[in-house]
Structures are given as C-alpha cells and as structure tokens.
Amino acid sequence: MSEGKRPGGLTALAVINFVFAAWGLIGLLGLVAMFAFFGKIPTDQMDETQKAQIEAFQNMGLSMFIFIFALSIISGLLLLLSGIGYLKQKKLLGWGLGNVYGIVSIISSIISAFMFPVEIGGGFRITTMIGLIYPIVTLVLLNTTFKEDFTN
C-alpha cells in the first residue's frame, strides 16, 4: 500500500483500541473505588450471589488487587499506544505494540481464568472466550491483512 494511505480497517482497529482503552480506564476507576470500600459495603440487603461476589473481592488480598491493577494499566497503555501507532502506521508503535497487546491479553485472560474465584469471573466461561476474541483478531489482522501497511 502506498505510504500515507492508511487502510480503513486499520483506522477501525485504532478506534476499537481507543474505545477498549477508555473502557479499561473506567474499569480501573471502578476497581480503585471497590478497593477503597473493602469491608465497608453492607451485605445484609443483598442476595446470596451478590454476597458471594463481595466476599470473593474482599478475600482476594492486596497482592491480587495489585496484579489486576497492573495488568489493567499495562493493557490500557498498550491499547492506547498501539492505536496511535495504527493511525501513524508506525512499525514499532503500531505493529509491535499491537502484537505485544495481543499476546499479553491472551496470557492474562488465561491466568485470570485460573487465579480468580468463579464468583468474580474466574474459570473458563463465555466471558473468558469473548475476552480472547479481540486479541486473537488483532494478532491475525496485524500479521496478515495489515502486515505491509506499517512503515519505519
């Protein structure tokens, strides 16, 4: 493809990255708020499922919270930076970080499935499979369809 002419699909991929990065930031803020209220959430008016979810989060521990927080920041930054790289068609910033995002996201989804209690999304469920779709699609598109569209 001629330099300066960005494929529409690559632009769409960048927009999706920005949307997912923003969504991740909102989730990160929710995670921080949840951590701030650990132990202060009244559960007497909740049903058993909600109580189990709150208790699972409260029993998660600080190290698990830090792990989730770090993964969220890393994923969000990779999405944002690779999205910018897609728009500028930069090899390292777009293609490179996009591939890193795909690999990190797949690995973190698998680790999360094993580490988290079922009450808070652990185990291989439909949400795990849905969470794997975008990173896999990203890897496939970057290494086939858009492989030649990145410069310097």
Indicate residue ranges for each PLM-predicted region.
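Topology signature of small-to-medium multi-pass alpha-helical membrane proteins
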Residues: S2-N152
